[in-house]
Amino acid sequence: MNEDQFPKAYDPKSSETGVYSFWERSGIFVANASSEKPAYSIVMPPPNVTGILHMGHALVNTLQDTLIRYKRMQGFEVCWVPGTDHAGIATQTVVERHLKASLGKQRTDFSREEFLKHVWDWKEKSQNVILSQLRQLGCSCDWSRQRFTMDPGANRAVKKAFKILFDKGVIYRGYYLVNWDPILQTALADDEVEYEERDGWLYYIRYQVVNSEEFITVATTRPETLLGDTAIAVSPEDLRYSHLIGAKVVVPFVNREIPIIGDFSVDASFGTGAVKITPAHDKDDYKTGMNHQLPMINILTPTGEINENGGIFTGLSREVARENIITSLEALGLFVKKEAYSSRVGVSYRSGAIIEPYLSKQWFVSVDSFRDSLRGFVNSEEIRIFPPEFVRNYLTWVNNLKDWCISRQLWWGHRIPVWHNKHDENVICFDGEGGPEEVMRDPESWYQDPDVLDTWFSSGLWPLTCFGWPDENSLDLKKFYPTAVLVTGHDILFFWVTRMVLMCSAMVDTEPFSDVFLHGLIFGKSYREYDEKGEWFYVSGERKRDYDKGKALPKNVVAKWEKLSKSKGNVIDPIEMIEAYGADAVRLTLCSCANRGEQIDLDYHLFEEYKNFINKLWNGARFIFGHISELTSRDLEEGVNQDLLGLEDFYILDRFNELLDLIDGHYNCYSFDKIASLAYDFFKNDLCSTYLEIIKPTLFGKQDSDQQRATKRKLLATLLINILGVLHPIVPYITETLFQKLKATLGTVENGKGDSVTGHAVSMLRSEACMVAEYPKPIHVAFPQGLRESFGIAERLVYTIRNIRGEMQLDPREPLQAFVISSEKKELVDVCIPIMCALGGVKTVEQLAEAPKDSIFSLGVVEGIQVGVILPPEHLAKERVRLEKEKTRLEKSIDSVSKLLASEDFRTRANPSLVQAKKDSLRNSQRELQSILDKLASL
């Protein structure tokens, strides 16, 4: 074979760019909204324009591309819309840091327009990198439909959706206790807050009862908020305090008189049984305050400092104010004690700041009217969630859903399309271009709301905006909406998935997708090194890479699987992996790990393993090419003579058909790991390690006729074409490269059909590319009765020979001489002998009536067939030991099955087929044992 035509080694770098350019030039990725084919559409979860792709992006886009390529080959009109997300808080934060580092300036040093220009510049650069990386990964997106969550179409959709909900009264504005990030100075939705268990203190503080010498003591984790206290609450059933309900106490430092109230929400066993109520700075207190119509006093500025309501503590940070208040309380004799206490603390998922419950005027979406439909879509299976165990999580979250705070105090994002009158409370919601007519007439009297919408508001409309909504005449919308499936991580089931269902169904009264597949989160291996004091730090750099490659860990270093994080040193860059291993190896690794919603443990060994498989695929194909290079597609068109097919040929065709059936089922339930495993095993084990090894003597002219050799070559070409089709959705680059080589080698037949064996392969060769070839279908032949049982016996005979070779410590390269004794299954043995020779490393196999008397041999029994291997004289003792071990094993098995069959309970209750199977097993074991005993006697 010419080295230039088919290099010995596969080099991903030299082929991937060219293959992708070929796909793009051919226009294969572009969907046709006017096509009569059934539609299959996916909208890409848009990566944030904050930086570059991470391994999570590589995973989710590999899975989507696998589905898209599979459905494209099945004849669907596929449309995969790529896009990027403006990611309000995240992107603004990144750009602010960039400007601080590069120019030494804060956001507030710029006008809003100037700052946004910097953000748009950042977005362009980041987006270009992201889209380039998606191409490297092999994503077959329709780039002509590329979207951005703040492009003009998205902006129209967002304004339209806001106005629809505003006009229905679903969107409202009001004061509410929100999650406030004092660093980013914006409100966050409940699910944007992460909770951490932190050690702190429980402070005990005394309040003096008005007109009394009595004091009431409360326990609190936040003494600084006493400046905003508006009540003390006790349980009405707590006899210690029942006489004080209705009395008043004085709040220290601000001298405010507040009531002692009875409320059944108070836990009398916590602290002293009395709690301070600060409605403006605690969510539970807010509810109590609403129930008792208490004043709500905000004591903090947006930056987290004490405001003018804090008296002498005005201007202090929360932390400093806490210390000063405790000191001052001690001086007044009002501080009792503090106790160590652990509590859950809310933390901003973006800035890491401790969240402050903060009374603020914000925009909200009322969710009560959507709750039934959100449940209904899933309960009726109009939306199917995979894996199904997440259905319960979804429904629990919907049942506990609270009004959604959608306003953010940012500059980057969709500006809220509402104008406020400067002189009264009038507002105008406007979804057109420019501004409302009233504003145009009198611009000095109006101002647009300065806030922007939560990123998830625009992301919630993503499936609609990608296909042209609110233009209801959009061909894309009619053809491709709703989409087929949403593929995403289970961590944003509530962030995004539920909001898409809410927003899209509110606009068009239809679910946005039929299925949701939630993959697991990627974990990487990190290494913690402990010092003598028991303190630890993360190992990084060369040492970590050495450990990743298998270097033994010292006693003070512990490996742990953790979520990917730069600080932990366990981040794996997908682009670095593509450069090192090739895109196909990366994709196959990710698919093989993509379990259903569980933790995904990813390390370098997996990339190495699947790179080796890619090389195996190349080398296996290269071997096959060497034996089919003289064939043409016309030879395939002629078909094969099925009378010349052997047991091994029927076996590989049966295995291939079974592979297709299993893979189709796994695609339907998104079991990507099983799809990858099945395809991997078929090519590596069934095709290469088994079938190719069996037929090598025929291919090399050492056995069988020329006609049989020609038949096997046609079958090899057919199998290679088909398995490339099966593998293509997962490993598209190498399969396309090999497919094009097949087309160049075999040529194409314009109208040829082939037969039931070769026909589909001939059809595939007529395709321009592997990615648009029709997906493989079962190959129909007249399979012999008992095929699987017969080949199974052949495999067990091979295993027995290999086992004897291993136990006798025979040289693996030494050809063996074997014999078979079977009066009942002579024809089956004749068929099995070539397989035994090829896979068992046996030079000759003779069928005998009885064991040779003048030879030393080792014997095994399979289904009543005795198989023996001739041994050198020095192996006599080893054979006796082996037979004794086999005798012990069989005696234990016979004893166990005999006891089971002696049980009347088993015989009467068990399935009759199971009882019969046990009887057959017992007979076979007894026969094998007798053979072993005879052999031992002869020794």
Swiss-Prot record:
Subunit structure: Monomer.
InterPro entries, sorted: aa-tRNA-synth_I_CS, aa-tRNA-synth_Ia, Anticodon_Ia_Val, M/V/L/I-tRNA-synth_anticd-bd, Rossmann-like_a/b/a_fold, tRNA-bd_arm, tRNAsynth_Ia_anticodon-bd, Val-tRNA_synth_C_sf
Ranges in a coiled coil: 874-939
Protein name: Valine--tRNA ligase
PANTHER family associated with the record: VALINE--TRNA LIGASE, CHLOROPLASTIC_MITOCHONDRIAL 2, VALYL-TRNA SYNTHETASES
Name of the gene encoding the protein in the UniProt record: valS
PROSITE patterns (alphabetical): AA_TRNA_LIGASE_I
Catalytic activity: tRNA(Val) + L-valine + ATP = L-valyl-tRNA(Val) + AMP + diphosphate
SUPFAM superfamilies for this protein: Anticodon-binding domain of a subclass of class I aminoacyl-tRNA synthetases, Nucleotidylyl transferase, tRNA-binding arm, ValRS/IleRS/LeuRS editing domain
Class in the EC hierarchy, top level: ligase
Family: Belongs to the class-I aminoacyl-tRNA synthetase family. ValS type 1 subfamily.
Chain residues that bind ATP: 566
Molecular function per GO: aminoacyl-tRNA deacylase activity; ATP binding; valine-tRNA ligase activity
